[in-house]
Amino acid sequence: MKTLTFEVTIRAPRSLVWDTMLGPEGYKAWTAAFSEGSHYVGSWDKGAKIQFLSPSGDGMISEIAENKLHEFVSIRHLGMIEKGVEDTSSEKVRAWAPAYENYKFSDVAGGCHVVVSLGKR
């Protein structure tokens, strides 16, 4: 799996960017750009289980691999949820799981720089 990397600088303090991106309402707002109605169920605490879901309830089953407040969060995606059933062991899922979604937040002049990477590690 190829690692994809995206970067953006946001004119806001790092703590505000973090809180907005990971808070329930802020998460719904920014993910609406690619999946209207997306939300999560669970906690951002290290080791916690978290589900990323569409309005129909389909989505991903994941866990928080790392969480350093206002600096870095790593999501380990373990499988899919389809029609209420968690799948972490099918051939389809084993082809890509685990996959990681990492967010790095850093201070820059005038705001916060966010680097997002998606891949196997």
Which residues does each predicted region cover?
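Hydrophobic ligand-binding cavity/cleft-lining segments
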Residues: M1-H39
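A generic structural signal for beta-strand entry/edge sites
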Residues: M1-T3, H70-F72, A109-H113
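Hydrophobic/aromatic beta-strand elements that line small-molecule binding cavities or substrate pockets
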Residues: F6-V8, I61-E66, P98-D107
